[in-house]
Design a protein with these regions (language model features):
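Low-complexity, intrinsically disordered terminal/linker segments enriched in charged
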Residues: 145-164
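Exposed beta-sheet edge and beta->alpha loop/turn motif
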Residues: 113-141
């Protein structure tokens, strides 16, 4: 009985290690996806280049998952994220960390800026925003297919002086 348990334990450990390891091809895919993703969003936010949201880097049916109604398509995605550039003329976007497996990436980010323009219909408050969050990303054939952002909305609204 003890011998069987020992063999089962060894088999279980080997299986878990094997399942948790990525192949060199998977590592390369994650690396390429991460590089592309970081280049696109750094160019968008820090160089203020909205035109980089295009069919070269995004699937036609790219989806931004949001609570009320998902944003679908390249133009919708460009307009959605464009609100951050319109609302914060000094927007500064930083990647804190990015990692992944296969076509899935996770991004930890920070966004800073002064609310000096229209932001999703909110008139300028002149307040500074320093917001961190996490994004789940799905890539397809080296293109961005889906994003879902997680951040503290109450903290954002409080920093903008809209909530107490």
């Amino acid at each position: 009985m003890e011998k069987q348990f020992k063999h089962l334990s060894i088999f279980t450990m080997i299986t878990l290690v094997a399942l948790g390891c990525q192949t060199p091809q998977e590592d390369l895919k994650v690396s390429e996806n991460s590089r592309t993703y970081q280049e696109v969003w750094s160019e968008f936010f820090n160089e203020r280049n909205m035109e980089i949201v295009n069919e070269q880097f995004f699937t036609d049916d790219v989806t931004v998952v949001i609570p009320d109604n998902n944003i679908v398509g390249i133009e919708g995605t460009k307009n959605y994220y464009g609100n951050f550039l319109l609302g914060f003329s000094d927007a500064e976007f930083t990647f804190i960390d990015i990692f992944g497996q296969g076509d899935k990436l996770v991004k930890h980010w920070n966004f800073k800026g002064t609310h000096d323009g229209d932001f999703f219909g909110i008139p300028p408050t002149g307040k500074s925003l320093n917001l961190s969050g996490t994004t789940l990303i799905l890539m397809e054939d080296g293109k961005i297919k889906q994003e879902q952002n997680f951040f503290d909305n109450l903290d954002m609204l409080t920093q903008l002086g809209l909530m107490e």
